[in-house]
Every structure is written in structure tokens, then in C-alpha cells.
């Protein structure tokens, strides 16, 4: 580790995403693994984080107490569960540590807690850290402005059998991008399930369909369907490394900032498109 490297702590270091985040850290210059965390009672406590990630021994021991390692990192990356992330967020706020949040499934109170914490510390909070997905979000804004008023809009997403929230955070972000471009409130126009006799489709609605099966990493399609034609904008992820690399790049971008709430559009400068 060079003296100038940004030290990153990974929450859920022994999970699939955590291991790939550690791998991503070792593939990028200017960043180093400072600490690794797992839930209390995990059999991985005390293990070497580098060995867990398949990169060899690195001397970073997995622990279960974030407060005990606050001096070992500059930025925390958290892709876990909402309740745990909010606990870690408060510890970061109290200790002046930046945080990158990839956790999905927050309720409105959780989102508000993140916003409030950003007054004190810098936060990147995004539903998806893939460069491609965030480009898609920008493309959807443009497509909605051209076709959205006269097209039926549907969002279809597919993930692995272990994903616990639905629709995915990315699907909701796609819906928000479209709704915002059309001046609509997603909460009012979203349709999350159809069953039985539903009547005709509300032309102002944005529909969501969810698939959970096998080991699908993540697939999202937004459809703008008119009579005689439709446009589909699709993103398919084949590896979690695309999310891991994006999150670590977000951590590097966040370094040196004092406070504020940001997303991947800020990290990638997509508002310039």
C-alpha cells in the first residue's frame, strides 16, 4: 500500500459482491484495501480478506465491529442490507468517513437518513454502479422525451434466485428516469403487478415485470411500445465485476470531497451528454 492510496473498507467481504470488490481494489491504482467486515457470528471472522477473494494473503483480517476499524479506512463500500447499511452510515457520519452505498431496498425513511447524513459526509448512493446501466438511464431520459407521451412504457428485469427485493433498484431507477423526463410521479403511475381482470392499460402508467431465476446477474429492458413499432433499451450484465469496478471508481472519485449526496451520473459526468 502506497502512502497516497485511498484506503477502502468492504462490508460483506466474504459474500459474492464483497469478494469481487476486493478483487477490483487490487486491479486499480490509487486505492488499497484497508479493512474488511462481516456480520457478527460469521464463520469468516478472523480470515484473511485477500485469501477469501482469491488474490492471496494480504494481511487484512475480517472483523465484525466497524467501530474498531474506523482508523483503518477512508471510505466504506457497502452492498449489504438496508438495516445494516444504515447502522454503518451512522458510524461513518460520526467519524467523518465517506461511504459508497450500493445497497437497494431502502424505504423512504432510509433514503431520508442517507440524505441527512450527506450534510456531514460525502456519499455516493446509486442503484447500479455499472457504467453501461448509468448510460442507459441517460438514454431513457432522451427516449422518454421523444416517445414517452404516446407509447406504452414497460420495464422488465431479471435477477438470480437469491435476490430479495423486487423490483430491483435499477428497474426503479429506470422508472424514475422516465417518469422525471415526462413530468410524472412514479409513485402515482407505477404498476407493479397484474393479475386477473385488470381492464385496459392506463396510457400514463409505467409497468414493471420481475423475473427471479437461476444465476442471472442482472438484465433490464425498458420498452416504449406504440402501434406498429416499439423501441427497447436493454442492459445485460454477465459479471458482478462491472458493478465492483464502478463502485471502486466511485470511491476514488469521492476522495477529497467534504460532504454531499452524489450518484453515478455525477461520477461519470453524464449530465454533460
UniProtKB/Swiss-Prot annotation:
Tell me the Gene3D superfamilies matching this sequence: Dihydrodipicolinate Reductase, domain 2 (3.30.360.10), NAD(P)-binding Rossmann-like Domain (3.40.50.720)
State which pathway it belongs to: Amino-acid biosynthesis; L-lysine biosynthesis via DAP pathway; (S)-tetrahydrodipicolinate from L-aspartate: step 4/4
Domain of life according to the entry? Bacteria
* EC number per UniProt: 1.17.1.8
Alphabetical GO biological process terms: diaminopimelate biosynthetic process; lysine biosynthetic process via diaminopimelate
Where does this one sit in the cell?
Cytoplasm
Q: What is its main location?
A: cytoplasm
- Please tell me which top-level EC class this enzyme sits in: oxidoreductase
Q: Pfam families of this UniProt entry?
A: DapB_C, DapB_N
Annotated keywords: Amino-acid biosynthesis, Cytoplasm, Diaminopimelate biosynthesis, Lysine biosynthesis, NAD, NADP, Oxidoreductase
Q: Which positions bind NADP(+)?
A: 39
Give the CC-aspect GO terms: cytosol
Q: CDD domains, alphabetically?
A: DHDPR_N
Q: Which family does it belong to?
A: Belongs to the DapB family.
- What is the protein's known function? Catalyzes the conversion of 4-hydroxy-tetrahydrodipicolinate (HTPA) to tetrahydrodipicolinate.
The name under which this protein is listed is: 4-hydroxy-tetrahydrodipicolinate reductase
Gene behind this chain? dapB
Amino acid at each position: 500500500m502506497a502512502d497516497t492510496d485511498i484506503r477502502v473498507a468492504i462490508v460483506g467481504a466474504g459474500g459474492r459482491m464483497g469478494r469481487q470488490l476486493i478483487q477490483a481494489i487490487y486491479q486499480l491504482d490509487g486505492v488499497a484495501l484497508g479493512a474488511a467486515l462481516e456480520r457478527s457470528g460469521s464463520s469468516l471472522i478472523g480470515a484473511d480478506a485477500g485469501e477469501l477473494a482469491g488474490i492471496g494473503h494480504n494481511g487484512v483480517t475480517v472483523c465484525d465491529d466497524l467501530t474498531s476499524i474506523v482508523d483503518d479506512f477512508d471510505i466504506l463500500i457497502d452492498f449489504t442490507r438496508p438495516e445494516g447499511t444504515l447502522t454503518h452510515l451512522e458510524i461513518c457520519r460520526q467519524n467523518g468517513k465517506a461511504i459508497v452505498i450500493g445497497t437497494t431496498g431502502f424505504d423512504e425513511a432510509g433514503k431520508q437518513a442517507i440524505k441527512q447524513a450527506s450534510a456531514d459526509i460525502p456519499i455516493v448512493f446509486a442503484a447500479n454502479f455499472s457504467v453501461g446501466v448509468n448510460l442507459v438511464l441517460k438514454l431513457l431520459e432522451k427516449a422518454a422525451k421523444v416517445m414517452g407521451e404516446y407509447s406504452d412504457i414497460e420495464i422488465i428485469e431479471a435477477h438470480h434466485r437469491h435476490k430479495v427485493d423486487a423490483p430491483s433498484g435499477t428497474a426503479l431507477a429506470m422508472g424514475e428516469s422516465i417518469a422525471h423526463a415526462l413530468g410524472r410521479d412514479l409513485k402515482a403511475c407505477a404498476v407493479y403487478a397484474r393479475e386477473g381482470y385488470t381492464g385496459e392499460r392506463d396510457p400514463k402508467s409505467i409497468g414493471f415485470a420481475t423475473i427471479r431465476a437461476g444465476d442471472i446477474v442482472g438484465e433490464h429492458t425498458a420498452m416504449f411500445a406504440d402501434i406498429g413499432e416499439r423501441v427497447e433499451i436493454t442492459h445485460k450484465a454477465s459479471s458482478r465485476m462491472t458493478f465492483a469496478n464502478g463502485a471502486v471508481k466511485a470511491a476514488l472519485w469521492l476522495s477529497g470531497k467534504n460532504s454531499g449526496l452524489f450518484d453515478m451520473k455525477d461520477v461519470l459526468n453524464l449530465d454533460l451528454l
